[in-house]
């Protein structure tokens, strides 16, 4: 009985995710879902990456997912782009964004005039991986401070993602991290994963990331 | 109807948590539940703290919670202490430890001869806060690399904890973190929170932590 309930939730979610994909296909918008542990640098990445896409003439929107507060959305306000905040607290403090929350958020965006919409998911390396948001691209951000074993310990996240960003590489000189082993562990879980090391603060790797996203643009 | 189901799960969990508290009260064991995002340094903390408690004559046990792998338990094996691994993957890749998993783990430990049992919960700053494990003390570990806004964005975790450890303080010189603001944000969510900054790698703050735990010992 319990399994049936979970299945129904996932089936309902997948149906809404398909509806989202239909909508973004119609408007030729690339929907990119950023997932990670809390504090891996998703918001800082958006602060730096979005102006680089704007400089190439693209129009950007953001869906901010947080349990509570609008702190991340406020950090992005200087970019002068449409931002929709989803707070999951009224829905029981949900630990992830489901398609049922992303779909109404899309209603608030003028998709026909947006080339890229970034979803910043709730900071959590576990649950967001279980729910399809309808995104075209799933991206996991893992900070170098989190340790090289994380892909093996949280495999589903790395299995559902197309791209892994190894963030905060500016801190590498002060850490014991074996970057090659981290890459190997990521590829052991998902051999198709594209991997970019980045430092949003220094700008390292962001041009590669920008060009990779532009190539996927319909 | 859905709310009813969630309530039943939480009620069943709370009943088992009470049973756990009865057992550890009988054996005079202090059960300590460590929670945090992935990669905040829970395992490294246990590697350093446990020998310091052993040096004071205390007997220690550990319950390791992971979705999959026994990597953390293996890191603790040199300590030569009883360790019980709980992998939540067979239970649907659960993102937290519930009392229903901790209770059978206690069966594998000789509680009468253990002064402290540490639970290393699944790395997740959201869901573990929602489920009482039956622990006497809830501890959140937040790494300085995660940013000062996290208590405001993940308030439930800081609300249910007695102690907050600000970890990896050895990295502070390379970060933009305002440590006073982080403390203020923690106390804004939970004014009763005890806070220790620590560096497990350098040993900073660990003697304070050890003495704080010993004072709570029955």
Residue spans of the language-model regions?
Chain A
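Walker A/P-loop
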Residues: 43
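The Walker A (P-loop) glycine that initiates the GxxxxGKT/S ATP-binding motif of P-loop NTPases
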Residues: 36
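Active-site glycine-centered loops adjacent to acidic/histidine catalytic or metal-binding residues
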Residues: 66, 167, 199
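Nucleotide-state-sensitive switch-loop elements of NTP-binding domains
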Residues: 3-22, 26-32, 40, 49-135, ...
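Phosphate/Mg2+-binding loops and adjacent switch elements
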Residues: 119-182
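Residues at the starts of beta-strands that form the adenosine-phosphate
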Residues: 59-60, 137, 162, 194
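Canonical P-loop GTPase G-domain recognition
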Residues: 171-218
């Amino acid at each position: 009985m319990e399994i049936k309930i979970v299945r129904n939730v996932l089936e309902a979610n997948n149906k809404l995710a398909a509806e989202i994909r239909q909508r973004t296909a119609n408007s030729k918008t690339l929907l990119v879902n950023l997932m990670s542990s809390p504090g891996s640098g998703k918001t800082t990445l958006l602060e730096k990456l979005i102006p680089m896409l704007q400089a190439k003439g693209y129009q950007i929107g953001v869906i901010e997912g947080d349990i509570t507060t609008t702190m991340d959305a406020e950090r992005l306000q200087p970019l002068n782009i449409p931002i929709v905040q989803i707070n999951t607290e009224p829905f029981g403090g949900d630990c992830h964004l489901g398609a049922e929350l992303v779909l109404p958020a899309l209603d608030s965006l003028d998709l026909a005039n947006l080339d890229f919409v970034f979803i910043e998911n709730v900071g959590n390396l576990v649950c967001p991986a279980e729910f399809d948001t309808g995104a075209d691209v799933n991206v996991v951000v893992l900070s170098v401070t989190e340790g090289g074993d994380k892909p093996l310990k949280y495999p589903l996240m790395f299995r559902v993602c197309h791209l892994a960003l190894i963030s905060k590489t500016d801190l590498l000189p002060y850490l014991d991290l074996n970057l090659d082993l981290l890459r190997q562990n990521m590829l052991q879980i998902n051999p198709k994963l594209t991997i970019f090391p980045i430092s949003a603060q220094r700008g390292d790797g962001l041009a590669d990331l920008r060009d990779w996203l532009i190539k996927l643009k319909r």
